[in-house]
Amino acid sequence: MSFIDSMKLDFVGHLFGIRNRGLATACCAVAVASAIAFPYIRRDYQTFLSGGPSYAPQNIKGYLIVCVLALFRQEQKGLAIYDRLPEKRRWLPDLPPRNGPRPITTSHIIQRQRNQAPDSKFALEELKATVIPRVQARHTDLTHLSLSKFEFHAEAIFLLPSVPIDDPKNVPSHDTVRRTKREIAHMHDYHDFTLHLALAAQDGKEVVAKGWGQRHPLAGPGVPGPPTEWTFIYAPRNEEELAVVEMIIEASIGYMTNDPAGTVIV
């Protein structure tokens, strides 16, 4: 150790009343590491805030929550996981590939899209507060609208409380409906116009493979989060993409209500 380094440690020890040279070294190392990490933490916190309202409050407490949950993050675009799930039916036809590369998404558990935003005029006229109610209106016998239990700020489609979920004749014989608390789909139309919804395994595989979405970062077996079937859908940018997204929402409703129409055994 150089004379200057020794003087620095003596100064740290004197400043904080620390007489143990090893403890002073540790305190100095922590201070340096904190100074290096602070700019990254500040940028990361701003990224968290830019994700908009969610289940985590937009403050330091919410940021710490998502940082802890990030320890359980799963990969989101692999396809093999779907073939290990018991549901082999499909409610979606073959989808066209989505144009262009996938959008950049947030690195946080609060899943949002960071680029490829829809045009503001299209978003306001065709997406905001219209897509979810319009699709749900076709299924009022089995679904209703309520505030999302995942996002707290989004209107969501739910399976009606009157539909029993313990009878496999009414809902699929797995725990997806139970784990989502009957929630089927919601759109973040207060922020980036992306969606979260539940899809049958083979429909989820089709959506991810064709570039229309990816799994939630906490979705997967053995993870304290939503079921594997919980899927993030990228924001539609035009009428053609909106038609595909509405088709995906319809498939989500079909799966969660166990609608026999249009199913295909694969």
UniProtKB/Swiss-Prot annotation:
Keyword Cytoplasm attached: no
Q: Which GO terms describe its cellular component?
A: membrane
Q: How is it used?
A: The availability of a complete eukaryotic luciferin biosynthesis pathway provides several applications in biomedicine and bioengineering.
Residue ranges annotated as transmembrane are 22-41
Q: Which Pfam families match?
A: Luciferase
Report how it sits in the membrane.
Single-pass membrane protein
Main location, first listed in the record: membrane
Q: What does this protein do?
A: Luciferase; part of the gene cluster that mediates the fungal bioluminescence cycle. Uses the fungal luciferin 3-hydroxyhispidin as a substrate to produce an endoperoxide as a high-energy intermediate with decomposition that yields oxyluciferin (also known as caffeoylpyruvate) and light emission. The fungal bioluminescence cycle begins with the hispidin synthetase that catalyzes the formation of hispidin which is further hydroxylated by the hispidin-3-hydroxylase, yielding the fungal luciferin 3-hydroxyhispidin.
Return the similarity comment: Belongs to the fungal luciferase family.
Q: What is this protein called?
A: Luciferase
> Its gene?
luz
